[in-house]
């Protein structure tokens, strides 16, 4: 369901300022499915999920983590930073 983590300047700024991680997911995935998958895979709690379809036809999800979890810490644990 989760295809990859987006690592762009905007994605890193969102992780730092708004505690959000940015993912590319399957087009058929619902917000609830995305939230459950992120919670299961990364052992964090999700507060909110926003999605959009990019001009390239990919589905992008902005996943806001609860205050107990830090998006930058998660990205560094995953080896993205």
Curated annotation (Swiss-Prot):
Task: Say yes or no: keyword Transmembrane helix present.
Answer: no
Q: Which GO terms describe its biological process?
A: translation
Q: Which Gene3D superfamilies match?
A: 3.30.70.330
Question: Which stretches are annotated as coiled coil?
Answer: none
List the Gene Ontology MF annotations in alphabetical order. rRNA binding; structural constituent of ribosome
Q: Which family does the entry's similarity section mention?
A: Belongs to the universal ribosomal protein uL23 family.
Question: Could you describe the subunit structure of this protein?
Answer: Part of the 50S ribosomal subunit. Contacts protein L29.
Q: What name has this protein been given in UniProt?
A: Large ribosomal subunit protein uL23
Source species: Pyrobaculum aerophilum (strain ATCC 51768 / DSM 7523 / JCM 9630 / CIP 104966 / NBRC 100827 / IM2)
Gene name linked to the record: rpl23
């Amino acid at each position: 369901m989760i295809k990859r983590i987006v690592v762009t300047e905007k994605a890193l700024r969102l992780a730092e300022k708004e505690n959000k991680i940015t993912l590319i997911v399957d087009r058929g995935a619902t917000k609830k499915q995305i939230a459950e998958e992120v919670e299961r895979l990364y052992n964090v709690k999700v507060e909110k999920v926003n999605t959009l379809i990019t001009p390239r036809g990919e589905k992008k999800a902005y996943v806001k983590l609860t205050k107990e979890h830090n998006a930058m810490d998660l990205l560094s644990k995953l080896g993205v930073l």
